[in-house]
């Protein structure tokens, strides 16, 4: 089996003090880049897709391509549902072969968030599917969901303890000052809050909104208990920027086999840097 649950890889990261990168992908080329690079560096790997990505590319297509790439590189990986909100949607994608999910009920009141997450955990654990959930809200935009900065909420440490105990989740995404998208100013992460959460919660902790974070912040967050680091926007910008630049310089270009090469190369450099920041090269 080359498509696996994220549970074991995150537990290993927690025990050994590194983080597993979760790279948001969209199509064949972006999947090729992350699997190839992770395999070359022997890094554990999670490939993530939002509901919009799965609608665009097709869940069956993503799972099939990921499985074939994982097999050809002899590199097990997790295909992960990022920021999914509906149990019925998750059930359909689990049936299609996904083994790692994030249920996002962070926009609901605390009790309703618990109830939704618990229903997903009860279903997914029957099929050895790992479940991540979010407590607190990140600002910025993820897919079609936009959260204004004033509506972002940090994770409360004591609520985190109760949330994990009542839901039975495998990992917890927390809000400590990161945001989706690129930062207009350097973020100030609440490392004290992260420490307090880690003291109360024994499951692996997840950091969303890592695109553009300084290496020192990622390294410190990992040292304080972060076990999974999500990167999306930085990958898209590298890929699309190189593609636009190539087409600007080669107006006659019409062959995707040519103009995708620099786009993939630019994205690969970001993937390599994130793996280095996570300290997970050679950890597969």
UniProtKB/Swiss-Prot annotation:
Biological process according to GO: D-tagatose 6-phosphate catabolic process; galactitol catabolic process
InterPro entries in UniProt: Aldolase_TIM (IPR013785), Class_II_FBP_aldolase (IPR050246), FBA_II (IPR000771), TagBP_ald_KbaY/GatY (IPR011288), TagBP_aldolase_GatY (IPR023955)
Any GO molecular function: tagatose-bisphosphate aldolase activity
Residues engaged in binding Zn(2+): 83, 180, 208
Cofactor: Zn(2+)
Cofactor: record remark: Binds 1 zinc ion per subunit.
Active-site annotation: 82
Organism whose genome encodes this protein: Salmonella newport (strain SL254)
Binding site for dihydroxyacetone phosphate: 181, 209-211, 230-233
Record's protein name: D-tagatose-1,6-bisphosphate aldolase subunit GatY
Chemical reaction(s) catalysed: D-tagatofuranose 1,6-bisphosphate = D-glyceraldehyde 3-phosphate + dihydroxyacetone phosphate
Domain of life of the native organism: Bacteria
Alphabetical keyword list: Galactitol metabolism, Lyase, Metal-binding, Zinc
């Amino acid at each position: 089996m080359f498509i696996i649950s994220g549970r074991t890889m995150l537990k290993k990261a927690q025990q050994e003090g590194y983080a597993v990168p979760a790279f948001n992908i969209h199509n064949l080329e972006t999947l090729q880049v992350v699997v190839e690079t992770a395999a070359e560096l022997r890094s554990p790997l999670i490939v993530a897709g939002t509901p919009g990505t799965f609608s665009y590319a097709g869940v069956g297509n993503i799972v099939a391509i990921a499985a074939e790439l994982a097999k050809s590189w002899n590199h097990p990986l997790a295909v992960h549902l990022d920021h999914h909100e509906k149990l019925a949607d998750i059930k359909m994608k689990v049936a299609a072969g996904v083994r790692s999910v994030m249920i996002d009920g962070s926009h609901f009141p605390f009790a309703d968030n618990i109830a939704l997450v618990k229903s997903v955990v009860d279903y997914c654990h029957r099929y050895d599917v790992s479940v991540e959930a979010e407590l607190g809200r990140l600002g910025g935009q993820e897919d079609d969901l936009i959260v204004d900065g004033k509506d972002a909420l940090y994770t409360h440490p004591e609520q985190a303890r109760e949330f994990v105990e009542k839901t039975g989740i495998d990992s917890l995404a927390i809000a400590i000052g990161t945001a989706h998208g690129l930062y207009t100013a350097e973020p100030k992460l609440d490392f004290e809050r992260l420490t307090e959460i880690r003291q109360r919660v024994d499951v692996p902790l997840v950091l969303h909104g890592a695109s553009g974070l300084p290496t020192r912040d990622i390294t410190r967050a990992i040292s304080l208990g972060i076990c999974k680091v999500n990167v999306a926007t930085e990958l898209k910008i590298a890929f699309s920027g190189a593609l636009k630049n190539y087409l600007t310089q080669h107006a006659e270009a019409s062959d995707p086999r040519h103009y995708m090469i620099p786009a993939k190369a630019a994205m690969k450099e970001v993937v390599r840097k994130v793996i280095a920041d996570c300290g997970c090269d050679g950890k597969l």
